């Protein structure tokens, strides 16, 4: 392979585009995307494109760079120990997600264990961005004068991925002053690094676990947070209190998380608190950002009405697909209240409140299915059912009122326990072309009933995996770190991680770093194999960008129009029975519970086949083709 050029970085001046190779040898299988490859209609629509929340953020990139620059440090490599990066000694894996994975590490300067989130700049999954998104972004960059030469699809996706990371770091840098938010320490990057390294505080118990054999089981993780008299209700109340404080802080900062779920809530044994993590999908109110734009408020409202997050945790006001007559979301902070309600319901009932065989059936149930039968007079239970999971957003409790209820022990609701809002029992139906189309499909398929005890199969597919809990010494000694942390073997009854693997090699993520330092060994190991090995470890339920995500069914219905790479399978075809990470199942008694969620909600085996309906000779079905086209436009653009 010929010498490689500089790789784009979080801080653009570290690797100016003029010094970068736009087409690399490992990307020759993917033809470059050029303006001539686009249709005239696309060029026309681009010239008339409305400003968006994303484009306004892009136009103010210098302000964002000024805010994140103090937290981004250049990578250096020790010439004696290849298992270190800067001051961090890297240890065992702590889990993986759709876009990267986390390693346990020890900071010699801080004298404590930290978490290092490693995000490859080149997306693992080529389906992460559609061809339309990539072409639109290239055209935008050209129109702004940011690029002057043709660019390959892979190079464009790399830059888009870096922008996504930049936004997440920007958000995390503004949210560092609350104990219930995972604290950003710093980020590491280099023009020779294939990955971005985000360093945060270590949460020793990992992601919030909720799936258990029996509804009344108490998970070992819970007992380390609630020390005395731990029960399902006391633990759920603890999570509610901690998350309420976290959301109150986000509200004060003008931040809407948009992806609250168990896998984005981390538990720390030392502080005995739950913390919110992963701000890649969040947005900030225009008033809270350090720049302004005449179109910002309108763009913000349009962004709020895009489906972002994990299907089972999405609020009903976002589930009205295809109805473009009005915006259903006016208070973005109540999206987070609903998602928190779903999370608490999972803890209380050991199941999701709404789930279907595919995401559209899930959306249908979120809108239509009532939870009134779950009201039982219990204060915590009814607070969750009647106030957090209130379908009518105008009646759903606000974060300010939730704080008051928890701090003053106010009554849950002025209404009788046996009552529930009319919107929850008989929600208003808003007919649109997409809703009409899927209504027909679901009618033809026939609805399948799921009994309470038959929930396990669906529930596991509906949840994201849980980061393993890893024990460390409270005061780890630097000299014996390799034995106390890097080679630790936690109690198998408490943890589900594969911890016997070797420490990560920095050479897997740095390309020809030694070209600028002859005293260092040659570090030219490519990380493609590492990325390939980790592809099956990814969670498929997270957002794909800071501003918009394509759900798996959207990726599926694009059919032939997605970027392709040799050796890559679309995530729709991934095996659902194969574990999604090297995490091991936790054995409880004679039964096994896998809180890692090997199968994901969106990867339903009975996902809808659009081609079968489009190609059908049935006249009734063919009438829906226009509705399909309407949805395809919605899937790519977030609007009709």
Swiss-Prot record:
Residue stretches making up the Protein kinase domain: 88-420
E.C. no: 2.7.11.1
UniProt keyword Kinase, yes or no: yes
Catalytic activity: L-seryl-[protein] + ATP = O-phospho-L-seryl-[protein] + ADP + H(+); L-threonyl-[protein] + ATP = O-phospho-L-threonyl-[protein] + ADP + H(+)
Keyword presence, Transferase: yes
Keywords, comma-separated and alphabetical: ATP-binding, Cell cycle, Kinase, Magnesium, Metal-binding, Nucleotide-binding, Phosphoprotein, Serine/threonine-protein kinase, Transferase
Biological processes annotated in GO: budding cell bud growth; cell morphogenesis; cellular response to glucose starvation; maltose metabolic process; mitotic cytokinesis; protein localization to septin ring; pseudohyphal growth; regulation of cell cycle
Family statement: Belongs to the protein kinase superfamily. Ser/Thr protein kinase family.
Name used for this protein in its record: Serine/threonine-protein kinase ELM1
Annotated organism of origin: Saccharomyces cerevisiae (strain ATCC 204508 / S288c) (Baker's yeast)
């Amino acid at each position: 392979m010929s010498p490689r050029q500089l790789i784009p970085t979080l801080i653009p001046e570290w690797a100016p585009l003029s010094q970068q190779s736009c087409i690399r040898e490992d990307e020759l299988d993917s033809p470059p995307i050029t303006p001539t490859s686009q249709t005239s209609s696309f060029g026309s629509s681009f010239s008339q494109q409305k400003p968006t929340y994303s484009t306004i953020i892009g136009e103010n990139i210098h302000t964002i760079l000024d805010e994140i620059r103090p937290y981004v440090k250049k990578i250096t490599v020790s010439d004696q120990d290849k298992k270190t990066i800067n001051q961090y000694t890297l240890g065992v894996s702590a889990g993986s997600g759709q876009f990267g994975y986390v390693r346990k590490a020890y900071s010699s300067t801080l004298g404590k264990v930290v978490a290092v989130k490693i995000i490859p700049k080149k997306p693992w999954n080529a389906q992460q961005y559609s061809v339309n998104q990539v072409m639109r972004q290239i055209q935008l960059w050209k129109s702004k004068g940011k690029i002057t030469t043709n660019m390959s699809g892979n190079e464009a996706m790399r830059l888009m991925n870096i922008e996504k990371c930049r936004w997440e770091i920007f958000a995390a840098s503004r949210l560092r002053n609350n104990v219930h938010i995972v604290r950003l320490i710093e980020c590491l990057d280099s023009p020779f690094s294939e990955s971005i390294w985000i360093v945060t505080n270590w949460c020793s118990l990992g992601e919030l676990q909720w799936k258990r054999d029996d509804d009344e089981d108490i998970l070992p993780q819970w007992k380390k947070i609630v020390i005395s008299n731990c029960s399902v209700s006391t633990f759920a109340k603890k999570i509610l209190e901690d998350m309420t404080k976290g959301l109150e802080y986000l509200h004060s900062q003008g931040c809407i998380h948009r992806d609250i779920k168990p896998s984005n809530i981390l538990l720390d044994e030392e502080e005995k608190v739950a913390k919110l993590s992963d701000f890649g999908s969040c947005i900030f109110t225009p008033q809270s950002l350090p720049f302004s734009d005449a179109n910002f408020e309108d763009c913000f409202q349009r962004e709020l009405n895009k489906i972002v997050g994990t299907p089972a945790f999405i609020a009903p006001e976002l589930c009205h697909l295809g109805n473009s007559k009005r915006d259903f979301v006016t208070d973005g902070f109540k999206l987070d209240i609903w998602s928190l309600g779903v999370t608490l319901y999972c803890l209380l009932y050991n199941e999701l409140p709404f789930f279907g065989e595919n995401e559209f059936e899930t959306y249908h149930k979120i809108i239509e299915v009532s939870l009134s039968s779950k009201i039982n007079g219990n204060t915590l239970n009814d607070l969750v059912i009647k106030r957090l999971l209130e379908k009518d957003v105008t009646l759903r409790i606000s974060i300010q009122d939730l704080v008051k209820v928890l701090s003053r022990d106010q009554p849950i609701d002025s209404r009788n326990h046996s009552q529930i809002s009319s919107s929850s029992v008989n929600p208003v139906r808003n007919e649109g072309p997409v809703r009409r189309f899927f209504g027909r499909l679901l009618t033809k398929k026939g609805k399948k009933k799921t009994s309470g005890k038959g929930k396990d199969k669906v529930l596991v597919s509906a949840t994201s995996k849980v980061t393993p809990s890893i024990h460390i010494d409270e005061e780890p000694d630097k000299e014996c770190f390799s034995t106390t942390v890097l080679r630790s073997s936690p109690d198998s009854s408490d943890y589900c991680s594969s911890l016997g693997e070797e420490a990560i090699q920095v050479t897997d993520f740095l390309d020809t770093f030694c070209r600028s330092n002859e005293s260092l060994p040659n570090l030219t190991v490519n990380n493609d194999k590492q990325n390939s090995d980790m592809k099956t470890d990814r969670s498929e339920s997270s957002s794909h960008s800071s501003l918009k995500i394509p759900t798996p069914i959207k990726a599926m219905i694009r059919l032939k129009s997605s970027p392709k790479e040799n050796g890559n399978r679309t995530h729709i075809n991934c095996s659902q029975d194969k574990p999604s990470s090297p995490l091991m199942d936790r054995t409880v008694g004679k039964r096994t519970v896998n809180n890692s969620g090997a199968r994901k909600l969106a990867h339903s085996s009975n996902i809808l086949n659009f081609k079968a309906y489009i190609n059908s000779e049935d006249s009734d079905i063919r009438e829906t083709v226009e509705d399909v086209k309407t949805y395809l436009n919605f899937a790519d653009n977030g609007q009709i």
